[in-house]
Amino acid sequence: MRQNTIRGFTIPELIITLGVAAIILSTAVPGVSTTIKNNRLATRVNDIITDIHFARSEAAKRDVRVILCRSSNPNSSSPQCSTDSGNDYTWTSGYLIFADSGTAANSIYNAGSDILLRRGQPAPSGVRMRTNPTWNRNLEFNPNGSIHEGSTAIMSICDDRGKEDGRQIIVSLSGIPKMYSDNISTCTPAYPDT
């Protein structure tokens, strides 16, 4: 005679298994969130550093000033550089890279005479990008690759975690960018100690 064996979990076994799974998930989910935020910041920093290298090399290649300017409409059919006279210092909306080859050479993108080289996309949600006064509206590269402004340019890229997890890009007078991620001084380089 065959005896049927019933297989399955008892209620206490099921409750214990679900409890262990809940504990594991409660420790893993915040780690995944941190990884996503770190990757979001790293991707943005890498994109900007790549574009800085691109702008610098194009200035040397074309023998003209190449400008990376902030823009509130980089994906528009007629994009423009931000021309506000205030001290906004925010670059989250995107930017343009263009060869200032027109007769005006005025650091303002003019579709009729300047050459649009690249459009920088807006920052991902939750990512803030702020600069110091040197880099306020634009970062200009001379044909020799140096920055036009004559002082170090700084951009801080942070999220809701603040400066402890933020990144900074510092462009030296020679035009070479470097990224810093350990204990950056501020998320708003235009206003020290904030």
What are these regions (language model features)?
Residues 1-11:
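N-terminal leader/signal peptides at the extreme start of proteins
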Residues 2, 27-42, 46-49, 53, ...:
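N-terminal helix-rich module
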Residues 7, 18-21, 144, 174:
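Short glycine-rich loop/turn motifs that provide flexible caps or phosphate-binding loops at active sites
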Residues 10, 19, 36:
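Conserved, well-structured beta-alpha core segment at the onset of a catalytic domain
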Residues 12-15, 89:
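Residue-level "hotspot" positions that anchor or transmit function at local structural transition points
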Residues 14-31:
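Alpha-helical hydrophobic helix detector
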